[in-house]
């Protein structure tokens, strides 16, 4: 059985992330989705809690009929030592053989630690980009088509859009 790791902050989880998960599951039997920066929330760059992000991811995967028995969703706090981060991750997760990542630092860290790294396609990175989506939310612009429907519904339900605008002082 093969198992891969897909690390990200998922602030918020969007359709690009969903496409990477689908792509990754074509290559491994099981996938660990690592929800990074789990200690962060209520900031402009990390507005959602780890628990909220886990719910966004799980609800989105259920919505598309994904087999959740093939998926682990694991929150993990940051450490400020990149040289041991890959080892740190391995202490939080089940064993994995391959890492799916596009972030150059993440790619470098896991390669140096001896892991196989596969770089997923960008899947329209200009649109499917959490920074861009957060900006649209702050501006009260349309972002609903950039995230899975369960994510959009959930963010409105928890008033995450209002939270983000209040954090930057632009509650319109």
Swiss-Prot record:
Principal EC category: transferase
What organism does the UniProt record list as the source? Saccharolobus solfataricus (strain ATCC 35092 / DSM 1617 / JCM 11322 / P2) (Sulfolobus solfataricus)
Return the similarity comment.
Belongs to the archaeal NMN adenylyltransferase family.
Which controlled-vocabulary keywords does the entry list?
Answer: ATP-binding, Cytoplasm, NAD, Nucleotide-binding, Nucleotidyltransferase, Pyridine nucleotide biosynthesis, Transferase
| Reactions it catalyzes | beta-nicotinamide D-ribonucleotide + ATP + H(+) = diphosphate + NAD(+)
Query: Where would one find coiled-coil regions in this protein?
Result: none
Name of the protein described by the UniProt record: Nicotinamide-nucleotide adenylyltransferase
Name where it's found: Cytoplasm
Biological processes annotated in GO: NAD biosynthetic process
By its UniProt entry, which InterPro entries does this protein fall under? Cyt_trans-like, NMN_Atrans_arc, Rossmann-like_a/b/a_fold
Pathway field of the UniProt record reads: Cofactor biosynthesis; NAD(+) biosynthesis; NAD(+) from nicotinamide D-ribonucleotide: step 1/1
Query: Could you tell me which SUPFAM superfamilies the record lists for this protein?
Result: Nucleotidylyl transferase
Q: Which GO terms describe its cellular component?
A: cytoplasm
Q: Which pairs of Cys residues are joined through disulfide bonds in the record?
A: none
> What's the EC number here?
2.7.7.1
């Amino acid at each position: 059985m093969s198992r891969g790791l897909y690390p990200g902050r998922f602030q918020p989880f969007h359709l690009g992330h969903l496409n990477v998960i689908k792509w990754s599951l074509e290559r491994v039997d099981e996938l660990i989705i690592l929800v990074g920066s789990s200690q962060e929330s209520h900031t402009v760059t990390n507005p959602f809690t780890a628990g909220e992000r886990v719910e966004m991811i799980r609800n989105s995967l259920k919505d598309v009929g994904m087999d959740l028995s093939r998926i682990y969703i694991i929150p993990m706090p940051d450490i400020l030592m990149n040289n041991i981060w890959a080892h740190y991750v391995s202490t939080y997760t089940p064993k994995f053989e391959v890492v799916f990542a596009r972030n150059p630092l993440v790619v470098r860290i896991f390669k140096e630690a001896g892991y196989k790294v596969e770089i997923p396609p960008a899947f329209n990175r200009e649109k499917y980009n959490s920074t861009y989506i957060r900006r649209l939310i702050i501006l009260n612009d349309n972002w609903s088509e950039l995230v899975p429907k369960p994510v959009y519904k959930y963010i409105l339900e928890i008033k995450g859009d209002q939270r983000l605008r209040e954090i930057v002082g632009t509650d319109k």
